[in-house]
Amino acid sequence: MQDYIERVTGGADLTVEEARDAARAVFEDATEAQIGALLAALRAKGETEAEIAGFAQGMRDAALTIEPDRGPLVDTCGTGGDDYNTINVSTTSALVAAGAGAAVAKHGNYSVSSSSGSADVLEVAGVNVEAEPESVEACIEDNGVGFMLAPVFHPAMKAVIGPRKELGMRTVFNVLGPLTNPAGADAQVLGVYDADLVPVIAESLSHMPVERALVVHGSGMDEIALHDATTVAEIDGDEITEYTLTPADLGLERAPIEAVAGGTPQENADDLEGILTGDVTGPKRDLILANAGAAIYVAGLADSLEGGVEVARDAIDSGAAKAKHDALREA
């Protein structure tokens, strides 16, 4: 560990395997001082795609994992930490994608970028967010959707709580959540809090067992946006394609960011329920259609992003998305 600290402090980059080994040390035997020193040195130098991938692999190595007999598995977990307090997009989108027929292994946590994260909203809605791995695996197999709370599946992360809190700044761990799905998701829509991270995270994903993914940043949002353009890196096997996406490309209208503002966990849960029942329409529904459509697209259930939006609309209007929400609550 000391060797890694000295090298990174000196400006050297770690390989994927070295970063993976450093992560192992962080979770197993490094002191808090060593952990803090390494994280600070990486931040000062700037984490490379290989280092992020290596840390993600090391975090997966230490995780409790599941292997649902369903596939391809899709996740909509993003980094959080964006500039806006919106409705909870990733969770609602995941339920809509599940309603469209995707097998969803939703990875999430409590709030980072909004008043309520995935776990906050689902907990208020009556979902057992702290379900053990075997229960989540069965839920995905039986219902086509399950929620994996990060602290339950990544107990080794306790080792970095103290150092991260004392450092008081973003570290490599701020981007690892979406890269460490405990079910080994095959397809992802992965929102990031900074546009500069889009190509970096896309390259990091190339080291992970993901077949299809969209890494997105929507003009300040870690989601596909309606208020402005979205920067996208699309991963399809070994190929990465970068482009810009507008609401018009999806057949949707632009809307100001204020139109999709979030609130308390209860208010966000009410919006989630309302979108799924059809009682909430307009920009909030459209924002979910955009992001659920992307998940449907990477799951292979639509030939285009705009086609994914149409499938998402049908999943809501038919009641299928609401049925998935009910099944998750009853599991």
UniProtKB/Swiss-Prot annotation:
Residues of the signal peptide: none
GO biological process, one term: L-tryptophan biosynthetic process
EC code(s) of this entry: 2.4.2.18
Catalytic activity, as annotated: N-(5-phospho-beta-D-ribosyl)anthranilate + diphosphate = 5-phospho-alpha-D-ribose 1-diphosphate + anthranilate
Cofactor descriptive note: Binds 2 magnesium ions per monomer.
Binding of Mg(2+) 2, residues: 222-223
Residues noted as binding 5-phospho-alpha-D-ribose 1-diphosphate in the record, renumbered to the chain: 78, 81-82, 86, 88-91, 106-114, 118
Residues binding anthranilate 2: 164
Biological pathway: Amino-acid biosynthesis; L-tryptophan biosynthesis; L-tryptophan from chorismate: step 2/5
GO cellular component, one term: cytosol
Protein name as it appears in the record: Anthranilate phosphoribosyltransferase
